[in-house]
Curated annotation (Swiss-Prot):
F-type ATPases have 2 components, CF(1) - the catalytic core - and CF(0) - the membrane proton channel. CF(1) has five subunits: alpha(3), beta(3), gamma(1), delta(1), epsilon(1). CF(0) has three main subunits: a(1), b(2) and c(9-12). The alpha and beta chains form an alternating ring which encloses part of the gamma chain. CF(1) is attached to CF(0) by a central stalk formed by the gamma and epsilon chains, while a peripheral stalk is formed by the delta and b chains. ATP binds at G169, D170, R171, Q172, T173, G174, K175, T176. SUPFAM superfamilies: C-terminal domain of alpha and beta subunits of F1 ATP synthase, N-terminal domain of alpha and beta subunits of F1 ATP synthase, P-loop containing nucleoside triphosphate hydrolases. This is ATP synthase subunit alpha. The gene is atpA. It comes from Lactococcus lactis subsp. cremoris (strain MG1363). Belongs to the ATPase alpha/beta chains family. Keywords: ATP synthesis, ATP-binding, Cell membrane, CF(1), Hydrogen ion transport, Ion transport, Membrane, Nucleotide-binding, Translocase, Transport.
Amino acid sequence: MAIKANEISSLIKKQIENFTPDFEVAETGVVTYVGDGIARAYGLENAMSGELVEFSNGILGMAQNLDATDVGIIVLGDFLSIREGDTVKRTGKIMEIQVGEELIGRVVNPLGQPVDGLGELNTGKTRPVEAKAPGVMQRKSVSEPLQTGLKAIDALVPIGRGQRELIIGDRQTGKTSVAIDAILNQKGQDMICIYVAIGQKESTVRTQVETLRKLGAMDYTIVVTASASQPSPLLYIAPYAGAAMGEEFMYNGKHVLVVYDDLSKQAVAYRELSLLLRRPPGREAYPGDVFYLHSRLLERAAKLSDDLGGGSMTALPFIETQAGDISAYIATNVISITDGQIFLENDLFYSGVRPAIDAGSSVSRVGGAAQIKAMKKVAGTLRLDLASFRELEAFTQFGSDLDEATQAKLNRGRRTVEVLKQPLHKPLAVEKQVLILYALTHGHLDNVPVDDVLDFETKMFDFFDANYADLLNVITDTKDLPEEAKLDEAIKAFKNTTNY
């Protein structure tokens, strides 16, 4: 059989035309140093700040330092499996995390991977971990209350949906308990909660998750955990991951509460990374942009305008102080970023006042706009009363001769302190808070022994649930007080059934 040259040439031409090369072009570099959660790579000349890079073993990193000769990378995974001389390539992408309703009830790490042993997660949706905060015209004033269920907060330092309220205090003063109670109180309030645990012991996080699960709060809660044993890059990225998950719900018209527990540990992790990346240290060895670290995170919390769906994201960041020093660097930074702070005091905590909220140092810059009408009426003078009581209490240590008015103020103050105490994980519905505060401010507790105030409160709630539920319903439905004469009559009817 004769071979025809023209047939062979046409076949070769056809194959050349249909040839598709089986390779991809990627800019690669070589790892020159790796250790303590960071790596340096030579050869990634066109890498961008914040760009994801991929090491030869599949682990991802994020470009942070763009120097003339090399790129400083934070490693988002096990840096021990990376070796000097390994190749690293650009991906052309920024870091994204999976978001969506499928995350509710799950415990995930800052990369969005489940760590609760309940199976794989694939939400099908992602959002950038770092996102631009809503602009001025995209926001709306905070006007809806976010009830925490804690009398001391809802009466003295009210929080609104879309607010940023700092919780600050020494270690072991009940900061996490305040946040867990606030999450528990969102049951049935059409609220999604995200608890971001940064740099905590895994056993502690496990305890918090078990508490939330046992009390039915995991049905509307996502837990993001970067434990103390994990590399610094994961602790640094964790709050932004939590914010990205919250934004998905906020931009879909829903309401979200995000707890960052705590940002002091994130700042320490960022300081560690910055020093390892040879960035110049500033005050307390923190880098110069440590303010921006927290401001760009907390500015993402907002109450969106009606045009954008009216959703909200409320932030409760934590800062741990040393010996009550709220004038420290990170503490003052975050105080200046947030819309108020709740200061938890050591002395109050150990004297049995729990939650240990210092009414003098705590403030909400949203204030009455985040309270229902009924609460405004009963809690209006509470802060002043408490402040003058503390002043009088200090003054009376030097003398015992007191006139009747001063004695009455002291008696009312002691009962106020008792009323604001609350057992752990027992948040209180707002109508019951209004009821007990009404009884306090209208003198119904003046003849109740101080030690019996909490017992009086419990019995009064039971009595109202059984006999005067309609009065409580008026507060729930109208957000205002019922007729004062009816309320006084009902409280007197209760007192007649007791020895008070």
